[in-house]
């Protein structure tokens, strides 16, 4: 990210990436799913909560990062670029499936009937492919990265905004014609997912898989929007000094954020904001808010120089996908590894929440305290990598 005229390195990008990863880990790991503060819950169906922002914020930043990473290929599709995209897409997708398999293995092993032999227990724990979820967060990241990267290398960049508009408009028409705003199995998204993926390989939520096949279409547009903002930030800015460069970025990001957010909320009267179907208005509003938040971070960190507080999130941001995977693996281990306690046994998760935190903070505050403690444990590992300048690229 260097220019012969001015350094275009933006620390705020790493910090926002780290904030979103820490946020994703936090909302996925409460002490008790039955005791969560309202802002830390996903919207039941239509609507938006702070929790609904963390994943789309990361995808927006992925779009900007994709622009930066593909720039070294001069945005020309060649063998090296194609193989890099293909390899990374496959690796991220398979890691997502591996996490799903690992979760089933650990939890079945921990709860298997006592009358099974070791071999039967091992086989039953290992062979869960007949009911493993095919899609998920990592899989969506993989598909969106792969599709957006290929588009960026094969299409004139000035035409990408029209493609984004076409994808979102076409998806809205699909939702309108296919009962796409219904929270049940008559929804076209559910119909397609159940026909292709089959229910055994889907997330169970009234027949709706929040990372399903058709809703990947607007998610690709989401990453492309981030790509376009990255292009506007880094190549649309010809400032001769860093201060002017950063100030110009602030204005650009803020204006883009206001326009997208206002447009999304305005259109939400006809197209509800909905994360589970990744509605077009959800794309506009979350990209707009991400752009505005990035502008705020650039002003605080890169312009004003208030950086000391940001080191915590930078430890997450420099190894984002690794830290997310680490959080998923630790969550599975905390929930499935048990030890004797009294007349029965208790998991690490259960011990920390029920025995250590809940008696001190209460049910809901204790649930939040567990999530924060879990983030701190992940950070300790991430910080060791950050301190040693170890960057694990996935």
Predicted regions located by residue number:
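Alpha-helical transmembrane segments and their immediate juxtamembrane cytosolic regions
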Residues: 1-394
């Amino acid at each position: 990210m260097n220019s012969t005229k001015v350094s275009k390195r933006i620390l705020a990008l790493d910090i926002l990436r780290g904030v979103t990863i820490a946020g994703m880990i936090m909302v996925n790991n409460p002490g008790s799913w039955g005791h969560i503060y309202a802002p830390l819950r996903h919207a039941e169906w239509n609507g938006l909560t702070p929790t609904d922002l963390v994943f789309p914020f990361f995808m927006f930043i992925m779009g900007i990062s994709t622009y930066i990473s593909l720039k070294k290929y001069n945005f020309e599709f060649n063998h090296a670029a194609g193989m890099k995209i293909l390899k990374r897409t496959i690796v991220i997708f398979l890691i997502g499936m591996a996490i799903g398999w690992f979760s089933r293995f650990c939890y079945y092993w921990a709860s298997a009937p006592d009358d099974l032999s070791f071999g039967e227990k091992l086989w039953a724990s290992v062979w869960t492919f007949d009911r493993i979820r095919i899609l998920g967060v990592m899989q969506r990241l993989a598909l969106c990265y792969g599709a957006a990267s290929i588009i960026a290398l094969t299409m004139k960049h000035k035409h990408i905004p029209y493609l984004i508009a076409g994808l979102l408009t076409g998806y809205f028409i699909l939702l309108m014609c296919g009962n796409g705003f219904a929270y049940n199995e008559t929804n076209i998204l559910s119909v397609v997912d159940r026909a292709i993926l089959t229910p055994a390989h889907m997330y169970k939520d009234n027949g709706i898989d929040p990372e399903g096949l058709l809703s990947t279409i607007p998610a690709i547009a989401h990453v492309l929007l981030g790509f376009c903002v990255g292009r506007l930030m880094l190549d649309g800015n010809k400032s001769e000094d860093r201060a002017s460069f950063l100030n110009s970025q602030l204005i650009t990001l803020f204006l883009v954020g206001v326009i997208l957010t206002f447009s999304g909320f305005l259109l939400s009267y006809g197209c509800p904001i909905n994360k589970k179907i990744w509605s077009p208005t959800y794309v506009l509003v979350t990209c707009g808010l991400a752009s505005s938040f990035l502008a705020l971070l650039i002003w605080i960190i890169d312009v004003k120089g208030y950086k000391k507080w940001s080191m915590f999130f930078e430890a997450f941001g420099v190894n984002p996908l690794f830290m997310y995977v680490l959080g998923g693996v630790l969550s599975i281990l905390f929930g499935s590894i048990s030890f004797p306690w009294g007349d029965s046994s208790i998991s690490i998760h259960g011990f920390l929440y029920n025995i250590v935190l809940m008696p001190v903070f209460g049910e809901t505050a204790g649930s939040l305290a567990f999530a924060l403690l879990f983030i701190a444990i992940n950070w300790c590992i991430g910080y060791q990598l950050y301190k040693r300048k170890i960057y694990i690229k996935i």
